[in-house]
Amino acid sequence: MVRKKHPPLRNVASEGEGQTLEPTATESKVSGKNKELSADQMSENTDQSDVAELNSKEEHSTHGQEPSSSGKKDLQISGLSEKAGFNYESPSKGGSLVSFPHDEVTDRNMLAFSSPAAGGVCEPLKSPQRAEADDPQDMACTPSGDSLETKEEHKMSPKATEETGPVQSGQANCQGLSPVSVASKNPQVPSDGGVRLSKPKGDLLVNDNPDPAPLSPELQDFKCNICGYGYYGNDPTDLIKHFRKYHLGLHNRTRQDAELDSKILALHNMVQFSHSKDFQKVNRSVLSGVLQDISSSRPALLNGTYDVQVTSGGTFIGIGRKTPDCQGNTKYFRCKFCNFTYMGNSSTELEQHFLQTHPNKIKVSLPSSEGVKPSEKNSNKSIPALRASDSGDVGKWQDKMTVKAGDDTPVGYSVPIKPLDSSRQNGTEATSYYWCKFCSFSCESSSSLKLLEHYGKQHGAVQSGGLNPELNDKLPRGSVINQNDLAKSVEGEPLTKPEKGLSGAKKKDFPSKGAEDNMVTSYNCQFCDFRYSKSHGPDVIVVGPLLRHYQQLHNIHKCTIKHCPFCPRGLCSPEKHLGEITYPFACRKSNCSHCALLLLHLSPGVAGSSRVKHQCHQCSFSTPDVDVLLFHYETVHESQASDVKQEANHLLGSDGQQAVRDSKEHSCTKCDFITQVEEEISRHYRRAHSCYKCRQCSFTAADTQSLLEHFNTVHCQEQEITTANGEEGGHAIPTIKEEPKIDLKVYSLLNPDSKMGETVPESIVKREKLDDKEGLKDKIWTESSTDDLRGVAWRGADILRGSPSYTQASLGLLTPVSSSQEQTKTLRDSPNVEAAHLARPMYGLAVDTKGFLQGAPAGSEKSASLTQQYPASGESKTKDESQSLLRRRRGSGVFCANCLTTKTSLWRKNANGGYVCNACGLYQKLHSTPRPLNIIKQNNGEQIIRRRTRKRLNPEALQAEQLNKQQRGSGEEQVNGSPLERRSEDHLSESHPREIPLPSLSKYEAQGSLTKSHSAQQPVLVSQALDIHKRMQPLHIQIKSPQESTGDPGNSSSVSDGKGSSERGSPIEKYMRPAKHPNYSPPGSPIEKYQYPLFGVPFVHNDFQSEADWLRFWSKYKLSVPGNPHYLSHVPGLPNPCQNYVPYPTFNLPPHFSAVGSDNDIPLDLAIKHSRPGPTANGASKEKTKAPPTVKNEDPLNVVKTEKVDRSTQDELSTKCVHCGIVFLDEVMYALHMSCHGDSGPFQCSICQHLCTDKYDFTTHIQRGLHRNNAQAEKNGKPKE
């Protein structure tokens, strides 16, 4: 249906044709591949006409219908050419891959083909006739166009082994291609390095995407093969997104990469489908074939249908057809040799059937239908090619010959190549196209020598039996690609390339393994000038030093090491070089996050040839498993690891690591991103690849917890090791090794800073901070990160304590805010930090970014005080930190402390250090008062900022409020013990830091302080919640000791420095809100207000209330005590405010309070002086809330204040609201609050007489000023008369 255009990975295509085809080459490749695969697998097309019909039907249906006639292999080239447009052959027999519409010639496809393949391609190129795998001969050759495309694919894929070969004989190419096609497809992908390919593919695919057929709506289980994430549904989109984000490190923004998505789906389905016992083989064939085919023929996935090849003993025995109606599961399995078909999800039955019914096929398949089976083995590879080009082409599967080794072991196949118009490249009519039966190696040659030589070197130790696929699986990725390169013999050592492929990422050009007993191989690093040459035997390669160099110096995991035999540094793109980029050391394990992309883009082979052994350069130890080799180094030669590093460095030049870092050329190992600025590369990793790297070494971690643990265990103990690069050698490596298991996110990709130990210039820090903020906003936070933070937070202090020997400077990460800037700097600079917003919390060194940006003085005193504080105030630090993070994390659970919204274009801090949305922050900034909730309007969740609808309080109130704020600020600093403003008053930090530990709240308050000198190490969300809790204790909390309520015992008595009550315009809040504790997050969110309404602290500083104000209130709201005696009473029996609701009538005035009395008429303050709860007029509280509290006149209420402090003069309960259960430490506050209660009921509003249902409703009503008569409500500020 949709043609996948693969980037011309390797247009080895013939000069002329290759060039023409190149554009199409990708397309043709893809189509060819798809075709080949489908052709192979689905060769069972009935009459071409029938098939064509089926195809068109299937295309329309998007479900690959089972080929109506699987048996018809008759499709001949002629038929194919006729049906050039015919897309889908019945998949029945051969179709190991889905008979995808990919073969179909769609207008799209035609266009694509036409342009590239000259006329031939345009021809019914796409008639993918899948000759049955059984009869390669039957594989009808598709029109020359197809062959050309196929050829191109082959050329490209085989690295155009002999560029000529594939192109020259369309048929031959098709045939040859079939085997190669898969490989080539895979190689192409690998060459991109996976990522690159995926992108181009995505781009190409974007065009193709139109066809994607809707996936089946049926419900099914979707499960991630790597981490087990799963869900039950009918849409794989979430699974794709999950895989892209968490395993490929890709942002979901690149959704246009449909091909990649298809591959991802295929990969998961593949895992489910690959049941064959020869799973590795299958895996290889399936993954390489199916995934690639699928990827190449994305339509199949989109179509919702594709086939999984089932192999047994290396013999292709049938297909598992997956259709949209059973998405995620194989619908049925079908024998390739007969019509045996059954529904199910396991190929076991098919394998048993094959062994019982077609035992003769086991051996025969290799030699007799060698063409078919090898191609089958190649799975998808060879068969698709079978669609030999036009019937006119000489090369046909019928012409296919088996090439045997001296022992009569089938080594591969050849097809005579006749020059095609389009494929004239190397073509001499005498040339034949050869392809290896065990891997993707293919070449064009006049003799079979190259193939035999390849066989001897790559498969000599292995029997030709079909079982080799495993080896093939291993070799193919690298070796196949390299082999193709070999075929191209672009470099003089074609044979070495397979090795390179295997060991190749190293870029060693080794002479062919088998060729010499001893050979000297040159190894060089892709990222720097590190090089070395080693003499070794034909069966081993010495890649240990290079691997260790990559891991230690470049922090590159072995699975991500790329190799291109044709490019000095292996960083080339297949479009530019004939060689394929391979990942010779990739483990390609399904659970390896580093290989997740590779599995999608590379031919799924096994990493490295089993025959190639990796020799230890320090002893005689050798092993085919790179992981084992690395482990060997770590365990046996750990002490020498540094030598290797040094060697690398020497090779690099004396520059060594510095050459890499100092040169400032930082390249991403996951993609082609290169930059001179370390911060940028760090940001790139963080945003694009979601990985965290240790700044001290090459260790990378998937999460911050792991990173912290690593730091604690490795660097805190090895403080003496200060080398920037792989200093830890063994430590780093083991972790790296395990990283694939741990790290779902993806790769460790940074060169450790050579300067890790050095302090980073502040300018950098500042800039980086800004960058970080951006990064954080951009970054999608996962809950795990917060969990990590939580886990890590508490350890920060320990880390600091545990690494005393590190000088702050040397420990870039841990500089405890020596100057907050330095700290930030170092943290930021460290890739870890960059990568993760993590570093700070992790190391417990978080410094308020804001503070730094503003340029906190970096006085040594400050640092000293901080360092001392650290152990004690780790929490406050984390908290600070978490909050600063909060501010910058969107959608991370942060909510506005004022309006509770979680959506905002920008997080701001209010005067109290709490996080507020842009709207509330701007409002407060402009009006110096919290944004009233009643004016908050939202548009699509985003708050709209508009003018206040209510009149502002009288100017006096505003001034008072401002004064309050000022005092509050200073008070907070004092209260917090930690300088409220580190920026402005560093000296405070010295004096108070030690105070911080005192009250539990102090830490938080300190945090709350604008600057938050130290960032608490608590998780962001938790920190905010804590802030809220700390700032406001739950409603039901009874009077707490002053210390508890305020950071400073001294201040506790009075509203913590009288942080004025009027943070918000709502009345009740003013009484209920603990005077702004420094960390007091904005005037709390609505709920917050009721939930933690009262601090045990008086909410209004008595000192701040001017007597005049009180008199005014008093005159306004004169409380008729007789009518409301209960206001003054306290209910002694109710210890818990929650429980203290007593039916209104039951409240009695305590005997010592007379319901009636001159006191009732006395102004509030006077009443208070009389030790009375001071009945205030019902509206007084409201008014007071609005203005007086803010008015800071310190005269009248001093008495109250002292009284409050002493508290001995009055019963505690006397200041407890019997209705709301709120306990006031301040009588005035109590009186004001009580004045809000009306006479008719416990929850009647005295201002508008509205009867509220309960205390919460009442609180909300008062707070928001929801008075029935708005005019009256506005008047509330004025004497109510």
Curated annotation (Swiss-Prot):
Pfam families annotated for this entry?
Answer: GATA (PF00320)
Q: GO molecular-function annotation terms?
A: DNA-binding transcription factor activity; sequence-specific DNA binding; zinc ion binding
PANTHER family tied to this protein: ZINC FINGER TRANSCRIPTION FACTOR TRPS1
Position(s) of the covalent cross-link Glycyl lysine isopeptide (Lys-Gly) (interchain with G-Cter in SUMO1)?
K766, K1201
Question: Species name for this entry?
Answer: Mus musculus (Mouse)
Q: Where is this cross-link: Glycyl lysine isopeptide (Lys-Gly) (interchain with G-Cter in SUMO2)?
A: 29, 263, 418, 457, 474, 488, 645, 737, 755, 766, 825, 850, 877, 879, 925, 937, 965, 1003, 1012, 1030, 1040, 1070, 1192, 1201
Superkingdom is Eukaryota
Main location class:
nucleus
Any GO CC annotation of this UniProt entry: nucleus
Q: Which InterPro entries match?
A: TRPS1 (IPR028440), Znf_C2H2_sf (IPR036236), Znf_C2H2_type (IPR013087), Znf_GATA (IPR000679), Znf_NHR/GATA (IPR013088)
Region annotation (Transcriptional repressor domain) maps to: 1163-1281
Q: Zinc finger spans (GATA-type)?
A: 896-920
| Protein's name according to its UniProt entry | Zinc finger transcription factor Trps1
| Span list, region Mediates interaction with GLI3 | 635-819
Which Gene3D superfamilies did the record assign?
Classic Zinc Finger (3.30.160.60), Erythroid Transcription Factor GATA-1, subunit A (3.30.50.10)
